[in-house]
Amino acid sequence: MKFLSYLVLVTISLGAVSNPSTGQDAKPEDQNAVSAKRKPSSMMEDSPVTFPERGALPAKYGRDVKTESYPVEKDYFLFSSPCRSLELIEKIQTEMPTGEFTPPPTDWKYLARTRQVLTEGGDLHVLGLGDSIVNDTFRSAWLAKLAAAYPKANIRGTVYVRGGGGCRHYRFEDRIQKYLVPLKPDLVFIGGISQGKDYEAIRDVIAQIRDALPEVEILLATGAFGTTDPRRPDLLAAAQHSGSSDYGMELKKIAAQLHCGYLDITTPWAQYIRSTDLHPHRFYRDRVHANEWGEQILSKILLSFFEVSR
């Protein structure tokens, strides 16, 4: 399907362009359970990029769409998405290195309402739940591209994240009931690199969401970026967030058992980076997180996953 290059209605307003020097320092703060200090990356051995000791490299492009933040407890962040316009996304994608990947398979069995809204119209509120990798995924503004591709649908997004955040954090203190349920999302995206193979917590969060919102659809996704070298299939097969590891197999099993969609985002992400013949850090802003180019890889993967004609 050809993705149309015009804006459609979203439930956020346009704002001033963010300062490019701070654009990548968006919420949440750059911290994760999988950090360079805890787990040094082998990618540093041949990296052509010098990262700051603290913080991230300055962004070339900031955000040109104003987002709305909502009250939430300390160290957690809750705000609207997307934060970039189609024009800015196009500029970033035009400049980024071209790569290739095999589109991940899409089984619409447990995402039937989402598919119906995309093709026939209606409201689709997508909520991203997880860590700073989930934040980066939604900062790619893939929802703006999705809205342009399916103009009959009224698509909006919300991001609920914590640095290093996984379901083991969201399951407690009534966080799902206090902060997620009142937003009444239609589709919840649970992903990132910080789940820590806590499968009980993932199941518990799904149950809490479903108890309050029985019609909600849920998409479970494996992780991307972090410190694992995507050029090394053997390392990916051992990574705690990877679609090619036992984590991916278990997450897929949970998705089938609990009637959720499943997305292995790890494999196409690694394929894209390898196909460019560039060092992976060309797509990073620090030792763990994506820069603007890296975020757009995630956007391309998600857009291919939600291709209804496949």
Show the residue positions of the predicted features.
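Active-site-proximal beta-strand/loop segments in catalytic clefts of secreted hydrolases
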Residues: 129-132, 160-163, 190-195, 221-225, ...
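Hydrophobic positions in alpha-helices of CheY-like receiver
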Residues: 205-209
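A short helix->loop->beta-strand "cap" motif at the edges of active sites that frequently abuts
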Residues: 211-218
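Oxyanion-hole/transition-state-stabilizing segment in secreted/luminal serine hydrolases
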Residues: 119, 127-129, 139-144, 169-203, ...
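Catalytic His-Asp segment of secreted/periplasmic serine-dependent ester chemistry enzymes
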Residues: 226-310
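A short beta-strand-loop structural module common to alpha/beta enzyme folds
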Residues: 153-167
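N-terminal secretory targeting modules
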Residues: 1-129, 134, 139-140, 147-155, ...
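Second-shell loop/turn segments in exported
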Residues: 127-134, 164-166, 192-196, 237-238, ...
